[in-house]
Amino acid sequence: MFHGPDKPWAGEALINTLNSLLSKARSAGAPVFLARHVGPPGSPIEPGSPLTQLVQELLLQGDEVIFEKSRPNAFAMTDLVDRLKACGSQGVVIAGMKTQYCVDSTCRAARDLGFDAVLIADGHTCTDTLALKAENIIAHHNATLAGPFCRVVHAEHWHF
């Protein structure tokens, strides 16, 4: 979706932020889980579609756990909870796209499932909609989710 027809807001900055987070996680020995959103066969995001692939700009090293999800919430219909518990994780750091769908849903679900949820304020993005510019969607979600659903922290201030 990152390289789809609608370009995400501040996409290059997001890639830099995500790569910084990956580096920090590795240095701290934190497990890294990456979700790929897939849709039904025949849809633009059917399994195997180029739109569902992780972007090549991410500096992956092969030690990441990459899983597919078919719902906005990364926990729904996946084994993410079991995998997190198996490695002793009590919290999750959430970043990616799209802000108003997958990022929002995953933040809310993480807290409901008992995880300490951290949303990286400058670590998620989306595209403009007919109603709002992407920058405003991101700011709104950072403000709305902070507190009841997660902690919102800028990447430069986050330490694993």
Model-identified regions with their sequence ranges:
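Short glycine-enriched, charge-decorated loop/helix-capping segments at active-site entrances
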Residues: 6-12, 44
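Metal-dependent nucleic-acid phosphoesterase active-site entry motif
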Residues: 1-4
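Active-site-adjacent betaalpha module
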Residues: 16, 20-28, 45-160
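PIN/NYN-family metal-dependent endoribonuclease catalytic core
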Residues: 25-43
